[in-house]
From Swiss-Prot:
Protein name: Adenylosuccinate synthetase
Originating species: Vibrio cholerae serotype O1 (strain ATCC 39315 / El Tor Inaba N16961)
Enzyme kind, highest EC tier: ligase
Positions annotated to bind GTP: 13-19, 41-43, 306, 332-334, 415-417
InterPro entries reported in the protein's UniProt record: Adenylosuccin_syn_GTP-bd, Adenylosuccin_syn_Lys_AS, Adenylosuccinate_synth_dom1, Adenylosuccinate_synth_dom2, Adenylosuccinate_synth_dom3, Adenylosuccinate_synthetase, P-loop_NTPase
């Protein structure tokens, strides 16, 4: 299938991508983030030690891996430096292995102020953003007024551009949202403080990755959030501000799309969602509470409680269409241990009585569907920490097989716990 693997979420994010990227990068030379920002929360557990990464690619804990932040990522210098410091305090040589595209848009304090002011103004209609400035930074990029990492090479020009964009945003903050403006002088001084560090990490990402491809190096592209949060294909407007799908890889890194190989879709054995937006299989009973408690379903970035529900094969089919998913990694199978019965959503009944086999695009249409469930027997045995299929109960194997039948895509990897070695690999993406 080739040396270039994409790992992305096929639900509403929080599927367990970080662990899988860390696991598979034993064989990789590069790990590339291509979209999102520090609104991502990728949790790794290695020999019992927990690491949460928000911006730096999950391959950073591997000595053999170069990590790249591509142009599709909106970069908060403050968040990056904090994350780097935490890793360096543990002896991880981040500066030797982390590289940045000069085309990365910068997230600056006025983006955060705007994000939070807007969410407050929306009241009950709030989207549920992380409040970290992601959306406003992407807006500035599209409006062609955003500042980028490359602008830090010329601080005189940077200061001039900053003054112009801050005048625009501070007017909104003061006169529309009725909150305090952000200090231009403070932001400029901040930028001067991290300019040298950021510019020292800049490389020509497209050239680097193309050279790596020609050498035959293994490259992994690490997605953030999930397909159903994609700005174009997700449950709009309850979405993130970037393209979280496989199509975002080329645009967000400059890597030629023809060279992409295996697309690994990450999916929980059930579904979760953080914040507002439609969620057809959501559970409001003790089973939902059980999934949330046993699965430790609290956001790595925000700490917010995640909503929990049954596995949704209908939404999954849409994710497969969009991403050309080669194979799945099914995570958190062990969370289903002990349930007497398990349900899978196999179709949506639409308001007109018709049955949909793939999910609708818009949030309004999503809100009006009635999920159709198939009930399967659960299992009392533990699957936690299983490393071979032989260790799984037959009913768990039947559940996995049914997901494969309903989606038409094989489950190639099964995660049975948070540690990197608590995994069953049927097919390795780099060997497929």
């Amino acid at each position: 299938m080739g040396n270039n693997v994409v790992v992305l979420g096929t639900q509403w994010g929080d599927e367990g991508k970080g662990k899988i990227v860390d696991l598979l990068t034993e064989d990789a030379k590069y790990v590339v983030r291509y979209q999102g920002g520090h609104n991502a929360g990728h949790t790794l557990v290695i020999d019992g030690q927990k690491t949460v990464l928000h911006l730096i690619p999950s391959g950073i804990l591997r000595n053999n891996v170069k990590c790249i932040i591509g142009n599709g990522v909106v970069l908060s210098p403050e968040a990056l430096i904090k994350e780097m410091s935490g890793l360096e305090d543990r002896g991880v040589p981040v500066r030797e292995r982390l590289f940045i595209s000069e085309a990365c848009p910068l997230i600056l304090p006025y983006h955060v102020a705007l994000d939070q002011a807007r969410e407050a103004a929306r009241g009950k209609k709030a989207i549920g953003t992380t409040g970290r400035g992601i959306g406003p930074a992407y807006e500035d990029k599209v409006a062609r007024r955003g500042l980028r990492v490359g602008d830090l090479f010329d601080m005189a020009s940077f200061a001039e551009k900053l003054q112009e964009v801050m005048a625009f945003h501070n007017f909104q903050l003061e006169h529309f949202y009725k909150v305090e403006p952000v200090s231009y002088e403070a932001v400029l001084e901040q930028a001067k403080g991290y300019a040298e560090l950021l510019t020292s990490m800049v490389i020509d990402v497209t050239n680097e990755l193309d050279a790596a491809r020609k050498r035959g190096d293994k490259i992994m592209f690490e997605g953030a959030q999930g397909t159903l949060l994609d700005i174009d294909h997700g449950t709009y407007p309850y979405v993130t501000s970037s393209n979280t799908t496989a199509g975002g890889v080329a645009a967000g890194s400059g890597f030629g799309p023809r060279h992409l190989g295996y697309i690994l879709g990450i999916a929980k054995a059930y579904c979760t969602r953080v914040g507002a937006g439609p969620f057809p299989t959501e559970l409001f009973d003790e089973v939902g509470d059980h999934l949330g408690t046993k699965g430790h379903e609290f956001g790595a970035t925000t700490g917010r409680k995640r909503r929990c529900g049954w596995f949704d094969a209908v939404a999954m089919r849409r994710a497969i269409q969009i991403n050309s998913v080669t194979g799945f990694c099914l995570t958190k199978l062990d969370v289903l241990d002990g349930l007497k019965e398990i349900k899978i959503c196999t179709g949506y009944q639409m308001p007109d009585g018709s049955i949909a086999e793939v999910s609708p695009m818009a949030a309004d249409a999503f809100e009006n569907v009635t999920p159709i469930f198939e009930t399967m027997p659960g299992w009392s045995e533990t699957t936690f920490g299983a490393k071979t299929l032989a260790e799984l109960p037959q009913t768990a194997l039947d559940y996995i097989k049914r997901i494969e039948e309903l989606t038409g895509v094989p489950v190639d990897i099964i995660s049975t716990g948070p540690d990197r070695n608590e995994t069953i690999i049927k097919v390795h993406p780099f060997s497929a």
